[in-house]
């Protein structure tokens, strides 16, 4: 099983991570490896200069985040794509939640290592809502991963 680390700047010390630097590389790598062959994905939120500008100009001083100011796709976009990709591979079926809990569910563990608290919260909230709707444990959290 593979592990994917999305970050435009940092590189994890643990060499088991496959590092991707942007949304495009992320989508390509997940499709190449296959969602069922990935055990863990850690997402940064701010990918690129305009995302970092938004972080320093609005998030840090004002605790607000305006996605209209960000030109690049973010880790949040990657989280949304993951859920959409999962449903493309596993079309939703109308079954009772008890049966859903017992059925096989293959989705990697998702974490975020973003320094941006609002972006990290958006990622964890989105993934945990998806897991809740699939009758699964809501285990997406913000983590620290040692990096160079």
Where are these regions (language model features)?
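Catalytic phosphate/metal-binding cores of nucleic-acid and nucleotide-processing enzymes, i.e., regions
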Residues: 1-148
């Amino acid at each position: 099983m593979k592990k994917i680390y999305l970050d435009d700047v940092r590189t994890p010390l643990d060499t088991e991570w496959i590092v991707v630097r942007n949304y495009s590389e992320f989508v390509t790598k997940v499709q190449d490896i296959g969602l069922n062959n990935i055990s863990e994905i850690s997402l940064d939120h701010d990918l690129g200069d305009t995302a970092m500008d938004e972080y320093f100009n609005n998030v840090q001083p004002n605790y607000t985040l305006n996605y209209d100011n960000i030109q690049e796709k973010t880790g949040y976009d990657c989280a949304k794509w993951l859920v959409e990709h999962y449903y493309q591979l596993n079309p939703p079926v109308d079954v009772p939640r008890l049966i859903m809990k017992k059925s096989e569910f293959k989705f990697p563990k998702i974490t975020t290592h973003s320094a941006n608290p609002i972006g990290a919260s958006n990622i964890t909230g989105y993934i945990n809502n998806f897991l809740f709707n699939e009758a699964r444990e809501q285990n997406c959290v913000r983590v620290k991963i040692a990096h160079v």
